[in-house]
C-alpha cells in the first residue's frame, strides 16, 4: 500500500521505530517531519522551527527520533511526543544522513562539505572523514562495523571502517 502525507513536497529521510512507526522528513517547504503509523495514518510530527531543510532521520536506542538539517549543523533528538530533548552540533552544516550506533554514537554526513562527523555521547563532534564527494544518506553495517556512504554525483559508494 502507499500513504500520502498531506502537504508534503519532498519526502526525504526516513526512520522506522520497532513498532513500525515511520518518521519521514520533508526537506522543502513546508519543512516538516511526518509520522506514519503502521496502520498508514499520516500526521505532522514536527512543523517549522527548529527544522531548517530537515533531511536525515534515525531512531536512537531509546526510541527517540534524531533529525539533521541541511540548513545548519543541528542534530536534534525528539521524544515520540514531539518534545525537543536535545540539540547537538555536527562539525559542519549541509547534513544529509544520520545513523545512531548501539553505544549511542551519532554519525552525520555532510553532503555540502563531504565529511562525516562523529558525536559520541556527552562529547563534542569531530570530523572522522572528509573529501567525500556528495556524502549523502548513510547506513551502518553492523556486521563489518562500517558506514556506507553514497556519493551521488560519482555513482559510487564510500566505505568507512569504524574503530
What residues fall within each predicted segment?
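A short beta-strand motif characteristic of beta-propeller blades
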Residues: 1-4, 41-48, 83-89, 123-129
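Beta-rich, blade/repeat-based domains predominating
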Residues: 5-25, 30, 48-64, 68-73, ...
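Short, structured loop/turn "capping" segments at alpha-beta junctions
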Residues: 29-31, 40-43, 52, 77, ...
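A short loop-to-beta-strand structural motif that recurs across blades of beta-propeller domains
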Residues: 32-35, 74-76, 115-117, 156-158
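Short loop/turn segments that connect beta-strands within beta-propeller blades
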Residues: 36-41, 78-83, 119-124, 161-163
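Short, basic/aromatic-enriched C-terminal tail that caps enzymatic domains
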Residues: 148-163
Amino acid at each position: 500500500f502507499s500513504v500520502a502525507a498531506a502537504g508534503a513536497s519532498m519526502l526525504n529521510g526516513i526512520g522506522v521505530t520497532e513498532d513500525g512507526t515511520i518518521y519521514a522528513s520533508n526537506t522543502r517547504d513546508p519543512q516538516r517531519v511526518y509520522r506514519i503509523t503502521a496502520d498508514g495514518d499520516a500526521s505532522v510530527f514536527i512543523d517549522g522551527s527548529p527544522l531548517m531543510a530537515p533531511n536525515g532521520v534515525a531512531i536512537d536506542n531509546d526510541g527517540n527520533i534524531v533529525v539533521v538539517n541541511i540548513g545548519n549543523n543541528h542534530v536534534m533528538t525528539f521524544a515520540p511526543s514531539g518534545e525537543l530533548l536535545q540539540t547537538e552540533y555536527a562539525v559542519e552544516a549541509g547534513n544529509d544522513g544520520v545513523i545512531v550506533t548501539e553505544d549511542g554514537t551519532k554519525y552525520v554526513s555532510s553532503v555540502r562539505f563531504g565529511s562525516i562527523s562523529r558525536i559520541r555521547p556527552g562529547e563534542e563532534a569531530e570530523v572522522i572523514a572528509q573529501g567525500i564527494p556528495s556524502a549523502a544518506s548513510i547506513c551502518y553495517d553492523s556486521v563489518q562495523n562500517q558506514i556506507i556512504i553514497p556519493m551521488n554525483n560519482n555513482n559510487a559508494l564510500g566505505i568507512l571502517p569504524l574503530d
